[in-house]
UniProtKB/Swiss-Prot annotation:
Species this chain originates from: Dehalococcoides mccartyi (strain ATCC BAA-2266 / KCTC 15142 / 195)
GO cellular component assignments: DNA-directed RNA polymerase complex
Record's keyword annotation contains Transferase: yes
Spans annotated as Disordered: 1250-1272
Reaction it catalyzes: RNA(n) + a ribonucleoside 5'-triphosphate = RNA(n+1) + diphosphate
Protein name: DNA-directed RNA polymerase subunit beta
GO MF, any single term: ribonucleoside binding
Classification lineage: Bacteria, Bacillati, Chloroflexota, Dehalococcoidia, Dehalococcoidales
UniProt enzyme class: transferase
EC number: 2.7.7.6
CDD domains named among the record's database cross-references: RNA_pol_B_RPB2
Length: 1272
């Protein structure tokens, strides 16, 4: 523990008091290393493997041409990352493959030639890809590993457990083995009909019954069950290799005539040819381990062998006989991760296979004398395969950039879905559930709440992925014995005496000295028993290897030399929890937070929260909007620094030096060698989610800089720590019912001081195209637009930077030529006088969308004249960025880090808020009823410890499962009370935060008869609490000098209950109502809580419509804010209107406010003229219903003189019952009759759809909709 008051961090200036009990043995690894390493592997090895797979390409006959690929290189990217984001381009590098062409007929070897193989998207230093100007992330895929799996299922008839086995290759046909209740082992090849396993054995060379029985005589020795004999007896007609081959061939190729040679070739191709069957490195490694085959080099034979099949059948018999355990398919030893490199490699392989096929076809037809490698190779399949993957794959995702944590989590995400994976419909409970093998590998907390729960996970903090794709986690090695010549023996305690014949060299319990070691090392090689100790040696282990060891928890008590302090240790062995003596412990966890992901380990007091609420807390932190004034949490966990570091949004100094220049856009550090390190800052950059990244320097010119020091913060960091929210003074109490159902009461102070104000940036684009009628023009000269609307536009018709814009304001003026019509004499005269100006153009300007506003912060113009690369038929392209400063408002969603979330119900004046005895009003009022049922008590502990830190003037770090306990929190509250009592707390308004004069407090405590230094020393837990309670009881007139421990607490509770005054350690205060000045009935929990504003902002959701677009068929208003739609008046709302008998309102809702076309047009006209609205007509949806019924051949009529839908005689003509002389219609002319009827039906349907244009033009922005359609 940290003593007294903590010192400020030299690099950041933040004072953090850490309550961690355990030392940091292993530093948090690079959190995005998985992405970076995987892509480097693809560039260096993955691509080479692919090129070796297809090289050389030969023609179909094999005697004309041969194309060899002998190497490849990536050249420099054409555009930088910044240029790609600005121009909506893809950040990529050109790939060139060196090819050599051999003309077989002449033996000529042509000069090697560099072939361009397309542009390959390049990963940025932050593990992302920029495609079409947007940042994307390729999510890693978690799927079943290639290999062999033995599972058990109960036979439905007998209830007997039987073995079922799958052999899954990386590429090729599956083999499925089954055992029947009659002891027959059968096999399915690629899902076809099953055959006895004896038939497959005969086909691969074990033709004789005796040969087959001899292979398994050692294993198949159960006197009651003879699996191999039963399988042989199952198919008595097949007795040799040829009949077995023909039988298998006829099942696999049922249409082809069977033939022994063809059959042998098919079997060899399907299983023993590496071109068609590939277990992969991983599959071969898993098969060798599971079948306990002799260790061959994994790359040696990636196809199947006869020995593999025999070994699989032996294992099936052992599992059936209970001599071997079945596999758990959800165990992480059986699931592997495909990282970005492998996913891109698989996609590239698809393109290369297509390329190879095209090249072979061209080889057969080209002229050998003039052939070149470029004439044979068509790179389009490769380019399209890669483009398709990055643009459209389920695993290539639009990066979540809401805040830095969201970015890191997106890069560390694991998905069980995607190509070759699961779908959410088929995935059951087992695959979604938390598995014991996830410990330290996949976070048990962080996963989505919806239908993807358990299918999408997140890597744990310390986990990494090995070369086979299995997740590993680190453990510290525990030694209880060492070799006698191991130098690590020096300084260790011996568990048993070491002797040489009769002479004792070192006694039990003694420490091995240098002299002792020299004597011991001369003994013949042997193991020396030492007292079990935890070394600093760290080993990363995959899940299947871990199952063999007993592993202690990270919080096991150790002394300073690493020896265990307890005689019995709580530990894990696979899925069991055991208590063992220290001698049996093999490894120990490196950290309590190794179980959790980054987001979960940012939740303080996670151990006191229910798992469901912790899940919500972890997910909601990713939705927090970066605020105008970033503030790091008062109560943190210590992971904030790591999250900010690896998000890439904080700039750290690479080398030490002096700040030579510090501006808003650039920092230059001059090193001791006189070299300049330049750091560019991002200014108001729009993220994918519309939030803002804005870096600002935290150093001054001339300041000395250390390597690794924070130079610049981002929008969501403070001094290099993640800062997603604000520290607020909260009170848990009811207040006028405004916090009913988790609603939140907010003080107006937070709005006034911009505590929860955030910046949101929208990007608007406009292109000027060439059309058939002429080119579009970006101009200030727009028809029928007043000067008022053009005042902020420059001479080119583009808005100026800094302009304030609102809904429907013009951002970029644009005119489009209209279709030319026959000109009248007057128009011809005007055209002759004014030339082109008088021609017909329409206004297609870019305007601010409805309901949006802000300030223009940037404008970029690209044009062909300036040499910019633009798409075909685009002459000019303008981008406008508009920033909004959004204050917090009623309806916004706020949340804590413990899954406690709510919507703001009222923003109350500061003077009305409840206030503390010193007059400080609280910032937020939360509902106490929201705590007990949710079981997230972490928020209460955070509130208490945050309050103590706030009053004592320091911030807190309390890591998950290793933080402050109840006593530490009570002591902190007691010290804050004692400091206030001593008058040592400076609460003056000019100070941003309160501060404590510890010396003054210590002196005052001394005057009261207690040791003040010990009270403020962490090495005396509980003392501060005891002293504060005694002094408080003394103030309350109770002598407690003789009381201590539980008695003292009991007495304090009694006095507090009677007096309704809180004791110093309960974290409560007597509050007064700001409106009346009276005290509330009971003391209220008041403290400091970290609150986040989530991206679900009410401003994005509030929407209103007067007139707008209508659906073409139903003629009802469209729905949703994006379509500028109306509010749905559904079935239940109609019932409510029925219930209240509001007939006229209901009629309006169902007619003129919806789809009565004529009625709504007349109603609009009546409102404009100030007349009464006339009687509604028939809704269009009713007419459509009638027409649909008529199209089914039903004679539906509307019996009403006013409503004309279809003449009754026409309806009658469409039905067979009323056809003239229908009983006389012969079979020959019936088709013509029906066809004529169908044509009539089609005509009547067209009359429904073909609605009048003027009715559709009711929409106020219908013209705009059609223009948008034209543009898109």
């Amino acid at each position: 523990m940290v003593s007294m008051l903590p010192k400020a961090d030299a690099a950041t200036g933040i004072t953090r008091k850490s309550y961690a009990q355990l030392p940091e043995v292993v530093n948090v690894p690079n959190l995005i290393e998985m992405q970076l390493q995987s892509f480097v592997w693809f560039q260096e090895e993955g691509l080479r493997e692919l090129i070796e797979e297809i090289s050389p390409i030969k023609d179909f006959v094999g005697n004309r041409l041969e194309l060899e690929f002998i190497g490849y290189e990536f050249r420099e990217p054409r555009l930088s990352e910044y240029e790609c984001t600005q121009r909506d381009q893809t950040y990529s590098v050109p790939l060139y493959v060196k090819a050599r062409l051999i003309v077989k007929t002449t033996g000529e070897i042509k000069e090697p030639f560099d072939l361009f193989f397309g542009d390959i998207p390049l990963m940025t230093a932050l593990g992302t890809f920029i495609t079409s100007g947007t940042e994307r992330v390729v999510v890693s895929q978690l799927l079943r590993s290639p290999g062999v799996y033995f599972t058990i299922s109960d036979d439905p008839a007998t209830g007997r457990p039987l073995c079922h086995t799958n052999l899954i290759p990386s590429r090729g046909a599956w083999l499925e083995f089954e055992t029947s209740n009659r002891d027959v082992i059968s096999v399915k090849i690629d899902g076809r009909r099953k055959i006895p396993v004896s038939t497959l054995l005969r086909a691969i060379g074990y033709s004789d019954d005796l040969d087959i029985l001899n292979l398994f005589e050692v294993i198949d020795n159960d006197p009651e069950r003879h699996y191999i004999q039963s399988s042989i007896d199952r198919d008595p007609l097949i007795k040799d290799e040829i009949s077995a081959l023909i039988d298998i061939y006829s099942r696999l190729r049922p249409g082809d005539p069977p033939n022994a040679d063809n059959a042998r070739k098919l079997i060899n191709e399907m299983f023993f040819d590496p071109q068609h069957y590939d277990l992969g490195k991983v599959g071969r490694y898993k098969v060798n381990r599971r079948l306990e085959l002799p260790d061959r080099e994994v790359g040696d034979n990636r196809a199947l062998t006869r020995e593999d099949i025999v070994a699989i059948i032996k294992r099936i018999i052992m599992v059936n006989n209970g001599q071997d355990t079945p596999d758990d398919i959800d165990h992480l030893g059986n699931r592997r991760i495909r990282t970005v490199g492998e996913l891109v490699q698989n996609q590239f392989r698809i393109g290369l296979v297509r390329l190879e096929r095209v090249a072979r076809e061209r080889m057969s037809i080209v002229n050998l004398e003039v052939v070149t490698p470029s004439a044979l190779v068509n790179i389009r399949p490769v380019v399209s395969a890669v483009k398709e993957f990055f643009g459209g794959s389920q695993l290539s995702q639009f990066m979540d950039q809401t805040n830095p944590l969201a970015e890191i989590t997106n890069k560390r995400r694991l998905s069980a879905m995607g190509p070759g994976g699961l779908s959410r419909e088929r995935a059951g409970f087992d695959v979604r559930d938390v598995h014991y093998s996830h410990y330290g590998r996949i976070c048990p907390i962080e996963t989505p709440e919806g239908p993807n729960i358990g299918l999408i996970g997140s890597l744990a903090t310390y986990s990494r992925i090995n070369r086979y794709g299995f997740v590993e986690t680190p453990y510290r090695k525990v030694y209880s014995k060492l070799k006698n010549n191991d130098k690590k023996l020096v300084g260790l305690k011996l568990a048993a005496a070491v002797s040489d014949k009769d002479k004792v060299l070192a006694s039990a319990g003694s420490v091995v000295s240098e002299e002792n070691f020299k004597l011991i090392s001369k003994l013949p090689e042997c193991d020396i028993q030492v007292m079990p100790f935890v070394s600093a040696e760290v080993k990363y282990m995959p899940a299947d290897e871990e199952d063999r060891y007993i592993i202690a928890q990270a919080n096991t008590r150790l002394d300073e030399n690493g020896y265990f302090l307890d005689e019995r240790i709580e530990a894990r062995l696979a899925e069991r929890y055991v208590i063992e003596p220290p001698e049996k412990i093999d490894y120990m966890d490196v950290s309590p937070k190794q179980i959790f992901s980054v987001a979960a380990s940012l939740i303080p007091f996670l151990e006191h929260d229910d798992a469901n609420r912790a899940l919500m807390g972890a997910n909601m932190q990713r939705q927090a909007v970066p605020l105008l004034r970033a503030e790091a949490p008062m109560v943190a966990t210590g992971m904030e620094r790591e999250a900010a570091r690896y998000s890439g949004q904080v700039i750290f100094a690479k080398r030490a030096g002096v700040a030579a220049s510090v501006t808003s856009e650039k920092i230059i550090i001059r090193t001791a060698e006189g070299q300049d390190d330049e750091y560019l800052l991002k200014k108001f950059v729009r993220t994918n989610q519309g939030t803002c990244i804005n870096q600002h320097a935290v150093i001054n010119k001339g300041q000395k800089i250390e390597a690794g020091q924070v130079l610049a913060d981002s929008s969501a960091t403070e001094n290099g720590e993640l800062a997603l929210g604000q520290n607020c003074v909260v009170a848990f109490m009811s207040w006028q019912g405004f916090n009913y159902e988790d609603a939140i009461i907010l003080s107006e102070r937070l709005v006034r001081e911009d505590a929860f104000t955030s910046i949101h940036i929208t990007k608007h684009e406009l292109e000027a195209h060439d059309t058939k009628l002429g080119g579009e023009e970006i101009t200030r000269d727009i028809p029928n637009v007043g000067e008022e609307s053009l005042r902020e536009l420059d001479e080119d018709g583009i808005i100026r930077i800094g302009a304030e814009v609102g809904p429907d304001d013009i951002l970029v003026g644009k005119i489009t030529p209209k279709g030319e019509t026959e000109l009248s004499a007057e128009e011809k005269l005007l055209r002759a006088i004014f030339g082109e100006k008088a021609r017909e153009v329409k206004d297609t300007s870019l305007r601010m969308p409805h309901g949006e506003w802000g300030k223009v912060i940037n404008v970029r113009v690209f044009s062909r004249e300036n040499g910019d690369d633009l798409p075909a038929r685009v002459n000019k392209w303008v981008q406008v960025w508009v920033a909004q400063k959004r204050k917090v408002s009623v309806g916004d969603k706020l949340a804590g880090r413990h899954g406690n979330k709510g919507v703001i119900s009222i923003i109350a004046p500061v003077e009305d808020m409840p206030y503390l005895p010193d007059g400080t009003p609280v910032d937020v009022v939360l509902n106490p009823i929201g705590v007990p049922s949710r079981m997230n008590l972490g928020q209460i502990l955070e509130t208490h410890l945050g309050w103590a830190g706030h009053l004592l003037g320091f911030r807190v770090a309390t890591p998950v499962f290793d933080g402050a306990d109840d006593t530490a929190i009570e002591d902190a509250l007691a010290r804050s009370w004692l400091s206030a009592k001593a008058g040592a707390t400076d609460m003056s308004p000019e100070n941003k935060r309160p501060s404590t004069d510890t010396a003054k407090a210590v002196e005052w405590i001394k005057q009261q008869g207690f040791d003040g230094k010990k009270v403020f020393d962490e090495r005396h837990p509980g003392l501060a609490k005891e002293v504060s309670l005694k002094l408080w009881l003394k103030d309350m007139g109770v002598d407690a000098s003789s009381l201590s421990g539980a008695e003292l607490e009991k007495k304090a509770y009694e006095v507090s209950s009677q007096s309704r005054l809180p004791s110093p350690i309960v974290g409560k205060s007597v509050l007064r109502d700001g409106r009346t000045g009276e005290t509330f009935d009971q003391p209220v929990t008041v403290g400091n809580m970290y609150i986040l504003k989530l991206i679900h902002l009410v401003e994005d959701k509030v929407h209103a419509r007067a007139t707008g677009p209508y659906s073409l068929i139903s003629q009802q208003p469209l729905g949703g804010k994006a379509q500028f739609g109306g509010q749905r008046f559904g079935e239940m709302e109609v019932w409510a209107m029925y219930a209240y008998g509001t007939a006229h309102n209901l009629q309006e809702m169902l007619t003129i406010k919806s789809d009565d076309i004529a009625g709504r047009a007349k109603a609009y006209e009546s409102i404009v003229k100030g007349e009464d609205v006339i009687q509604p007509g028939v809704p269009e949806s009713f007419k459509v219903l009638v027409k649909e019924l008529q199209s089914l051949g039903l004679a539906v009529e509307v019996i009403n003189e006013e409503v004309k839908i279809a003449p009754s005689e026409k309806v009658a003509a469409l039905t067979e019952a009323n056809l003239p002389g229908s009983e006389d219609v012969s079979a020959e002319i019936l088709p013509e009759t029906l066809y004529a009827g169908a044509e009539d039906i089609e005509d009547s349907m067209m009359s429904v759809i073909d609605t009048d244009d003027q009715d559709l033009a009711m929409s106020s922005n219908d013209e705009e909709v059609s223009e948008n359609d034209e543009r898109s």
